């Protein structure tokens, strides 16, 4: 975030960040309220030095103690003037993100969520002289710990992986470098196939968004809810073969490996499990079989790879 005073007088304002933490299952978050409202947990570091930067950080650790080894972190590249982690405290009873109570009152309540709906919000009070400019980096990230290194002390999560993550992006210069690298990555991917027409919307759809969605499909398959991790339904044999047609020109090496993974689940008679697990590379007849067009799509995907 870059803020510049283009006026002729000093300006005094406050900036708020606001995120709502998922409790690790987006679908369940929206319906299992009698359970979810009892599980939320956070830790807050109002001021901490990471590298050469003073920062503030909020850690979302719901179910970390009970059965998880991961947590989320929201941080800002300065020592914040206030924070909130309780949604009701920040927004207000019957309030709305369109006009949060804390913003309306120009304050923060330094609330600590214990159950209910954990959020992350920082308040930064800013003073700008005429022509003065200030920059802030807001970060949201994810960290994991091995089971034998979950805790820093009793009840306090091990934050070392979070510190390493935050130090990579906690200055405007580091942020600019990371953003440039991300732009180079996508420019390289998307430059493999370019359409030039008079219809700029068509160009944007074909050259950017369609190819981007194909890459998302490669990374996530046709996942939903908690299937992203490769559990439950897994990846579809037919789906994955069809998806190859969209991204084989972008990442042919990865497409080749995907073909090998898919083919490894095929039987000697040519039939196949309808789904397979990407983590184990094994199919499961309990979750579907007998889809006779499955192996036909492997031929189409392999042919597309050979042509590429």
Predicted regions and their residues:
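Amphipathic alpha-helical scaffolding segments
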Residues: 17-20, 142-143, 260-265
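Hydrophobic beta-strand core residues of beta-sandwich domains
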Residues: 5-9, 128-130, 234
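Beta-strand-rich interaction surfaces with strong enrichment in secreted/lumenal proteins
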Residues: 109-113, 123-128
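Short Pro-Gly-centered flexible turn/kink motifs
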Residues: 11, 126-144
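A generic structural motif
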Residues: 3-8, 142-144, 249, 289
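Substrate-binding groove/exosite segments of carbohydrate-active enzymes
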Residues: 115-118, 132, 187-308
